[in-house]
Amino acid sequence: MDERLPVFSQLSQRQSHFFMMKLILEIEPKPQSRPRFAKRGSFTTTYEDKNIKAWRDHCQLLIAKQYAGKSMLEGALKARLRFYIKPPQYISKVKKNQQALLDEVIPVDKKPDIDNYEKALYDSMSGIVFKDDGQVAMHDVGKFYSLKPRIEVEIEEISN
């Protein structure tokens, strides 16, 4: 590895004077769906699933409420995201899993992919917390089973 490139933890220590914000969104995480296509006469149009649109609108309201009065972040950003997902019954009903579910330490190793959750959240944050999700230069993302579904977000400016 190139010694000149800062690692995630080193950058955290050096850049601590920049703004950092935290959000806890009490909403069940949803993955971004693929665009849908429809043929209308000789034209093909794209459209978005209604469920993800409604979810994103609700998520934007929650973000706007918690982020009210703050200006949009500028420059490069570092994100730490935790998606807490309701476990399926075959996990939640097993007695030996109860404490692990309470501790929120069981990682989700099933579909949907983590980047689809991330994309849906970043799209909801764009225009409220930051101008564009392209500003996110570093990220630490995890998805875990929890009896309290939610999304926890930490965003930190690492340059401006």
State the predicted function of each range.
Residues 2-160:
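Acidic, proline/glycine-enriched N-terminal capping motif
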